[in-house]
């Protein structure tokens, strides 16, 4: 049995199982044996690497991802999957080295520290941005007393206290939260109060409860940053109050895309709380804004004695014109869907259809001892 026939047999086995079990490794032996006979197809190498990862054979998966890069050094797919693999294993230094290779090859990304799965070329890449880059920063900082007063009033109504974690807020990781709790290191606590998010039914304003609690804050945000409000409404970003307890660490991670930037307005900023974006550290100051690109590797640590609270605003990258927001978003969603599809779709030939029809609902069997040159 030659390499192509073995691969087709493996695909047929896989397709018969994958709908019932998306994490199936059916057909793995046939895929491996096919690639041993003919390792020249990078698409086959890519799929085999993914299947080996699901099988828990991580060292072999890594080896095949590296072979994909060697076979297609100007394609970003292998670099991206290897970087995600290394990051999931906590091997961030190695992930940066692979990203550096990708940048030098012109395959994907512009900086080894900036590794989002969806990367739009042509946008300025830098971890930190200056306040002077955003004229609206002064207006937001000018509203700091009113914003903080409304937050403290909320604390009073709900029995929370200014120096402690607001227990009435949603814990990040909860199904009602806007962000992923996986990055909170064990023992930490991260809570949020959503001002604008995809959970709101209105397309242009906050929900009635939020408007009642934060009338001045919402009026300012809707007049000053309508694009950021719209971004939050469609689920690409969010505008929230973000609280991190003392002793909490948010582990290093990269956001999914470089189409947005992040603003933090400091509301409660203890000494010892800090954020690293790329290789550089930053801190917060009450009443002041900081700006960074969260598609860069970043982490947050609160070694202070009290809670750290900021007003967090995601907004479109300033070099992305408004008329391109939706088309860029749609392209990014298509790119992300294609990435997911590559992981579950082995390259197939017409021979696979023949095998599936022949199977008539019965598993396609490939014997482990079958010689490669059998008919």
Label each region the model flagged.
Residues 33-34, 67-68, 102:
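Canonical positions in the second alpha-helix
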Residues 50, 54-56, 70-240, 244-259, ...:
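Fe(II)/2-oxoglutarate oxygenase catalytic core
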Residues 261-266, 289-291, 306-322:
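A short hydrophobic beta-strand segment most commonly corresponding to one strand
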Residues 267-286:
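A short beta-strand-loop-beta hairpin characteristic of the jelly-roll/cupin
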């Amino acid at each position: 049995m030659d390499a192509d026939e073995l691969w087709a047999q493996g695909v047929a086995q896989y397709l018969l199982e994958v709908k019932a079990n998306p994490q199936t490794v059916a057909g793995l032996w046939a895929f491996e044996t096919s690639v041993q006979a003919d390792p020249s197809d990078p698409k086959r190498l890519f799929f085999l690497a993914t299947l080996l990862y699901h099988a828990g054979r991580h060292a072999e998966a890594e080896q095949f991802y590296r072979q994909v890069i060697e076979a297609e050094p100007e394609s970003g797919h292998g670099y991206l999957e290897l970087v995600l693999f290394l990051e999931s294993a906590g091997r961030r230094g190695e992930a940066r080295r692979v990203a550096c290779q990708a940048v030098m090859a012109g395959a994907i990304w512009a900086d080894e520290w900036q590794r989002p799965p969806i990367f739009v070329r042509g946008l300025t890449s830098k971890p930190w941005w200056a306040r002077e880059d955003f004229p609206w920063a002064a207006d937001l900082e000018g509203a700091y007393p009113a914003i903080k007063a409304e937050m403290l009033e909320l604390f009073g109504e709900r029995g929370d206290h200014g120096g402690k974690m607001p227990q009435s807020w949603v814990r990040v990781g909860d199904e009602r939260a806007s962000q992923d709790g996986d990055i909170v290191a064990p023992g930490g606590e991260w809570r949020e109060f959503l001002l604008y998010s995809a959970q709101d039914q209105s397309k242009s304003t906050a929900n009635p409860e939020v408007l009642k609690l934060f009338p001045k804050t919402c009026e300012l945000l809707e007049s000053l940053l309508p694009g950021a409000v719209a971004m939050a409404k469609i689920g690409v970003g969010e505008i929230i109050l973000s609280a991190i307890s003392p002793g909490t660490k948010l582990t290093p991670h990269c956001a999914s895309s470089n189409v947005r930037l992040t603003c933090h307005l400091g509301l409660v900023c203890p000494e010892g709380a800090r954020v690293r974006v790329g290789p550089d550290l930053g801190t917060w100051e009450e009443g002041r804004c900081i700006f960074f690109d969260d598609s860069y590797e970043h982490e947050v640590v609160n070694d202070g004695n009290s809670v750290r609270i900021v007003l967090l605003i995601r907004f479109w990258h300033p070099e992305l014109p408004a008329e391109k927001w939706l088309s860029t978003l749609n392209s990014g969603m298509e790119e992300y869907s294609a990435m997911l599809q590559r992981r579950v779709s082995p390259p197939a030939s017409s021979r696979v259809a023949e095998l599936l029809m022949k199977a008539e609902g019965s598993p396609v069997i490939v014997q482990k001892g079958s010689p490669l040159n059998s008919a």
